[in-house]
Curated annotation (Swiss-Prot):
Keywords: Coiled coil, DNA damage, DNA recombination, DNA repair, Nucleus, Transcription, Transcription regulation. Disulfide bonds: none annotated. GO terms for cellular component: cytoplasm; Ino80 complex. Pfam families: Actin (PF00022). GO terms for biological process: DNA recombination; DNA repair; regulation of DNA-templated transcription. It comes from Gallus gallus. It is found in: Nucleus. This is Actin-related protein 5. The keyword DNA repair applies. Proposed core component of the chromatin remodeling INO80 complex which is involved in transcriptional regulation, DNA replication and probably DNA repair.
Amino acid sequence: MAAGRVFAFRDARWAPDPVLAPSAAVRSPQPVPLVIDNGSFQTRAGWAAADPSVPAEPLLRFRSLAARSRGARGGAGAETQVGNDLGSPEPLRWLLRSPFDRNVPVQLELQELLFDHVFQRLGVASQGCVDHPIVLTEAVCNPLYSRQMMSELLFECYQVPKVSYGVDSLYSFYHNRRQNWPCSGLVISSGYQCTHILPVLEGRLDAKNCKRINLGGCQAAVYLQRLLQLKYPGHFAAITLSRMEEILHEHSYIAEDYTEELQKWRSPEYYENNVHKMQLPFSNKLLGSTLTSEEKQERRQQQLRRLQELNARRREEKLQLDQERLDRLLYVQELLEDGQMDQFHKALVELNMDSAEELQSYINKLSLAIEQTKQKILQAEVNIEVDIVDSKPETPDLDPLSSEQSLEDVESINEFEPLFAEEQPEAEKPVAAVQPVFNLAEYHQLFLGTERIRAPEIIFQPSLIGEDQTGIAETMQYVLERYSKEQQALLVQNVFLTGGNAMYPGLKARVQKELLEMRPFQSSFQVHLASSPTLDAWYGARDWAVEHMTREEGWITRKDYEEKGGEYLKEHCASNVYVPIRLPKQAPRTTEALAPSRALAAGTGNPCEQA
């Protein structure tokens, strides 16, 4: 197998975002809009200004995550980290929190932490408020309650002058427009949590016919993690979600024909040429693998000294306990000699003994054991350190007590450290012995074969993970069938792919193949890929903000918020469709309906007053 097919995990740590100093063009002649792509995977923020001195790139890019440590008891020392300040997500995985449920923000206290991070790192200098207009992305067909809470947060907490909401994939479509705007097309947006099929007619979203698939990059990462953990149970803990996301981003691809691609992987030659080996981190210095004979000898002697000290400590503790028990038994024997029979018999019962003979026998045995323990302690103090490497000493040890102690130490060492059980040092082993070669690095490698296509395939075949949903191809066909033939032909001339999953190699070819199968014979269609699938949403929002900076179209002012409610939305070319809440009106109560109730009230008055 080619060595170039071995890839090491980068395990890159996130660098904390610096506090940026905005240029003067951001505030003069008036505050420019602040564009925030509020994605469930990543938050991107930057300025929208026509001045060339202001970067036309998102200045902040961080994961939409926050972690709050508990600190000491009472909350003292608690710390909150947001985005790139986390460093690495794996050690804090159990503490990570996201404001999103799927792709809809529902935890507004966590959303406030993300906004605080954005405003603080971008250097917003206004006191007590954010005096910049905000352009914010939201989910397709965002629930009114979610928009109401978001508007309340922006207007009440940050005192923003105005805000505009738009859909990220429609902003990307707006940024990549290839015809004179407004234009029509079919937008396929596949992100971290969801995949959407969005028909756009004459520059406006047709919300009645848009469809959502509850699968995205998050589910693909979890599926890939389960596949590899089942394949390599020995590396269960090393197969983390962060590494699975790295595999998806850099080593996965979409098969143009999934079944045919699986057949290719059955060929050993194809497998050898296309498998990717992911190298897990490991340590070469294993026990006994790289130690020299001198290091092994020194290690043995250190362990021997520690075990001798441990045995000596145990003997001293045993001697102390035996001595205390012997003193108690001698005290009971003195009661017998003094004639205190009642106390003597009571003490025998407490000691679980039956007679004075049994007491005397136990005293003799305990005295002998104490004497032997004292001799062992004295012998250990004067004994020379035993060389356990030399298994055949020149002169035999004639002292049985010393021999017993040495054997006890050696057995303890062999149980404690497998290194001590070796027969001979390396220098004394026969030269002809051939040691088997074991590639430790290969043992810590993950071989990616069909897994490279199985994980991304779930957006086309959700049944792979047990989801009862249709994939992109079936959903796209279902949406197209809801239009007339003329409108279908118009939509398929501009099929637009965007979102993080559009980065998979082969996605465009797969969509073209699916369209070729479902469209009439010899009909034409065109599939376009976003120039930057992950960043075009921010670029499109910036384009819209620069073009509509001085207009009223699409901007919700504070007056609109106070008069029409937090769920109010001003529509524009990249926004959702606003569907206001229509509460049923109560019918007014007529005088005819009130007459019977008045008569009933008069008839059931106070009986005392009637009398």
